[in-house]
Amino acid sequence: MKSLLLTVTLSSLVATLQTYDDLPFISEEDKLSGVWFIKATVSQRREVEGETLVAFPIKFTCPEEGTLELRHTLASKGECINVGIRLQRTEEPGQYSAFWGHTLFYIYDLPVKDHYIIYCESHPFQKISQFGYLIGKYPEENQDTLEVFKEFIQHKGFLQEKIGVPEQRDRCIPIHDSAHQDHKC
């Protein structure tokens, strides 16, 4: 019975999103205010084989209409890097720009409550880099939204092998921290 329900739910989600150009953009920035969890990522870069993909919560704030601020921690080579990005809404629906217009963010509202896709195109130095995130309000996996994300990124030209489902962690602890030598970021 559960598999039948899952199949029906998934089929309706996929049918709803048949044309991904019609996937609705977020309508109100304040819907994103709060803490979010990265459920899946995709990027053109090849990730290091055998290395665990780790994600930390993202915090969005909406200081004024048309502006989103994103605070996030990244782990790189055992170091914790705190990142703050200010996104400014453009004239295009669902589009936000950052880094002097070199990076465009598109925020898609999914039919599953409290889930969004953030798709980014970065154009620094005439190179184009694309990446995407499936985010949710809660850290637990949601198979339905993951399937929608897979279909979405395939439509954008990514290979499914590039999808990463990260291990959720509350906070980043640098590996050089002697109290936590066994804990890698």
From Swiss-Prot:
Superkingdom of the source species: Eukaryota
Alphabetical keyword list: Disulfide bond, Pheromone-binding, Secreted, Signal, Transport
Intrachain disulfide bonds: C80-C172
Keyword Signal attributed: yes
Signal peptide boundaries: 1-19
GO cellular component: extracellular region
Keyword check for Ribonucleoprotein: no
Cellular localisation: Secreted
GO MF, one annotated term: pheromone binding
Expression sites by tissue: Specifically expressed in vomeronasal and posterior glands of the nasal septum, the ducts of which open into the lumen of the vomeronasal organ.
Pfam family, one: Lipocalin
Role played: Transport of lipophilic molecules, possible pheromone-carrier.
Family (UniProt): Belongs to the calycin superfamily. Lipocalin family.
Protein name: Vomeronasal secretory protein 2
Source organism of this protein record: Mus musculus
Taxonomic lineage from the root: Eukaryota, Metazoa, Chordata, Craniata, Vertebrata
Annotated gene: Lcn4
